[in-house]
A protein has these predicted regions:
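Mobile, glycine/GP-rich and aromatic-enriched active-site lid/loop segments adjacent to catalytic centers
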Residues: 1-205, 209-215
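Amphipathic, heptad-repeat alpha-helical segments used for oligomerization and assembly
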Residues: 209-224, 228
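Internal hydrophobic alpha-helix adjacent to the cofactor/substrate pocket in enzyme cavities
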Residues: 226-243
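Non-catalytic terminal regions with compositionally biased, polar/charged low complexity
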Residues: 239-255
Length: 255
């Protein structure tokens, strides 16, 4: 992720309005996704065309297929924020050498992306780098083998659990699947997904809770991590005051 300055807001937004992108345009390279159809015609802050044009014209290397993605907001000051444009594969978030390589390659590609935007996207002629993200973003590393591991069926079919400690909308983003929370559908979050097998008095929350890949595409999101984190914090406090092991706490009391 990087952040630009020097953008002509008016020209940039005119181009966005003239050639709007929808979620159906997430159909190439690293951004190829399956939807359930309802998202396809919705507006998406997606940019791909200038990078493809730069590749076609030889401005960017022909094998560079990882550039393309979304932008956050454009301001009167000329700042264009949250350029989530660079996607890197085969980076092991538990390996320091991989992380170093990812930091270097990600920043190199960000500068190439800026070069393409300056040449091919209205409003970006005078754009320049404002700053990089503090570190490479990692979506998935180690996962807990929990007393209950959430499944794709749970997150796609409004899973319900007797030990639910919270709910989360049907928002799934990852592993080639995109379902946006537009219908009011939601899943429950089971307390057991934070409890490791064969280890007592330990709670694991955040993106490391138990689940398969598609479940992770939902539970990794920050707002879901906040819900689970709230439940874990309450459970930990109750366990301390009641001298009760985490696995023995009543989920109804936590909820």
């Amino acid at each position: 992720v990087f952040h630009l300055a020097g953008v002509d807001k008016s020209a940039f937004l005119t181009e966005i309005k003239t050639n709007p992108q929808a979620y159906k345009d997430w159909s190439d390279g690293e951004w190829q996704v399956q939807t359930d159809g309802k998202e396809d015609e919705m507006f998406s802050p997606f940019i791909k065309k200038p990078f493809q044009q730069a590749i076609n014209d030889g401005v960017l290397p022909s094998d560079l297929r990882t550039i393309g993605g979304t932008w956050g907001a454009v301001h009167d000051t000329g700042e264009l924020t949250y350029m989530n444009i660079i996607q890197l594969a085969k980076i092991d978030g538990t390996n320091p050498d991989d992380l170093t390589r990812g930091e270097m390659e990600g920043r190199r590609q960000a500068m190439q992306a800026i070069k393409a935007l300056k040449a091919y996207y209205p409003g970006c002629k005078n754009a320049k780098l404002r700053n990089f993200g503090m570190s490479i973003g990692i979506r998935d590393t180690r996962k807990l083998d929990a007393l209950y591991n959430m499944t794709e069926k749970d997150v796609r079919n409004q899973g319900q659990f007797e030990d639910s400690i919270g709910i989360y909308p049907e928002f799934i983003d990852g592993y080639g699947l995109l379902i946006l929370p537009t219908t009011g559908r939601y899943m429950q979050l089971p307390y057991r997904s934070m409890l490791p097998k064969n280890v007592d008095s330990l709670l694991v929350t955040g993106r490391a809770t138990g689940g398969d890949k598609i479940a992770h595409a939902a539970t990794r999101n920050m707002s879901c991590c906040s819900v689970n984190g709230q439940g874990a914090g309450v459970a930990a406090a109750m366990g301390t005051t009641a001298l009760t092991m985490a696995a023995a706490l009543a989920a109804a009391a936590v909820a």
